[in-house]
């Protein structure tokens, strides 16, 4: 197992992943960070939990749409 340090919403998190998956995990974290920053810029003042909920709903919607296309 490897350990990776990622930054999301200005906070650092240490996460475990399989050996060789470090770059993949870092790319996922970067995508999440970009999306949170985008939501923040569109939503103005919103709490961290509000951002997380908005992102979770957005991702769930994207997943549902992808499943319908299959």
Task: List where the protein language model places each region.
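Basic helix-turn-helix/winged-helix DNA-binding cores
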Residues: 1-29
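Amphipathic, hydrophobic secondary-structure cores in small proteins
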Residues: 5-6, 12-13, 42-54
